[in-house]
């Protein structure tokens, strides 16, 4: 097995539908600009409230991807 280094960054996904949809939005959006995305770990879940009702579900994710020198 070759040596590898991974970078971890935090993203927040938002959806009016569900936490799952919020996580999917975050991963799919990050994957458009981050190559070799490997793992997404949900670290926090919360909601925004408007007029006494849930307006949006939010998921904070730590995403990891293979580090390439020069990036």
Positions of PLM-derived features:
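Short, well-ordered alpha-helical segments
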Residues: 4-37
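Residues in well-ordered beta-strands of folded domains
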Residues: 12, 43, 64
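Amphipathic alpha-helical hairpins
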Residues: 2-5, 9, 43, 53-55
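Short amphipathic alpha-helical leader/targeting segments
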Residues: 36-40, 66
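Short, conserved loop-to-beta-strand elements that form functional interface hotspots
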Residues: 40-49
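C-terminal structural segments of small proteins and small subunits
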Residues: 52-71
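Basic/polar N-terminal segments that are highly enriched at the extreme N-terminus
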Residues: 1-2, 71
């Amino acid at each position: 097995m070759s040596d590898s280094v991974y970078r971890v960054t935090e993203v927040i996904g938002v959806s009016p539908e569900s936490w799952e949809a919020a996580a999917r939005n975050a991963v799919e959006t990050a994957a458009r600009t981050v190559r070799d995305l490997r793992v997404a770990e949900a670290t926090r879940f919360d909601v925004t409230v408007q007029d006494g009702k849930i307006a949006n579900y939010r998921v904070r994710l730590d995403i990891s991807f293979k580090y390439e020198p020069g990036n």
